[in-house]
Amino acid sequence: MSSSNIQRPKILSTLPSIFSYLHDAKVRSKMTFADIAAEMDRDEWYVAAIFYGQAKPDQADIVKLSAALNLQQRYLDEAFGPDFFPHRGLGEFPPQDPVLYRLYEVLVVYGYPLKHMIHEKFGDGIMSAIDFEGHVEKVKGSSNEDRVKITLNGKFLPYRRW
């Protein structure tokens, strides 16, 4: 299969070519992010973030990623070297993609109630997106329908008083 036949997420056209290279290799391998994560001893969310330039793999990650996807490690070493830094916060605002828009909509509709509950339980502060883990699960609802369960797990950071 040539790379020209691979359907790529639109956002990849705005990123350095290494990310299209990674996505193409993932498609050819028929591996999921969960499969790759298992090979790398990482969480699938973190691995997916690497594929969009939102996280920086360390050297051990690069070795495992190149082995998992049968890629030449030197390309990854060059791309993710000392000059690489993640570009977090990709995309349009508000998002146009239906999945991303629904996540945005959740925060628009339920953001203030969530903020209020965080303040009631923890005090004045924020949930870190730096000291953070996220997980996505497929679960069954009460009518046996497929449901998406997203867990956001961030360190609480109180605002400092001075």
Curated annotation (Swiss-Prot):
InterPro entries: Cyanase (IPR008076), Cyanate_lyase_C (IPR003712), Cyanate_lyase_C_sf (IPR036581), Lambda_DNA-bd_dom_sf (IPR010982). It catalyses: cyanate + hydrogencarbonate + 3 H(+) = NH4(+) + 2 CO2. Catalyzes the reaction of cyanate with bicarbonate to produce ammonia and carbon dioxide. It is an enzyme of class 4 (lyase). It comes from Mycosarcoma maydis (Corn smut fungus). One of its GO terms (biological process) is cyanate metabolic process. It holds the Pfam family Cyanate_lyase. This is Cyanate hydratase. Keywords: Lyase. One of its GO terms (molecular function) is DNA binding. The active site is at 102, 105, 128.
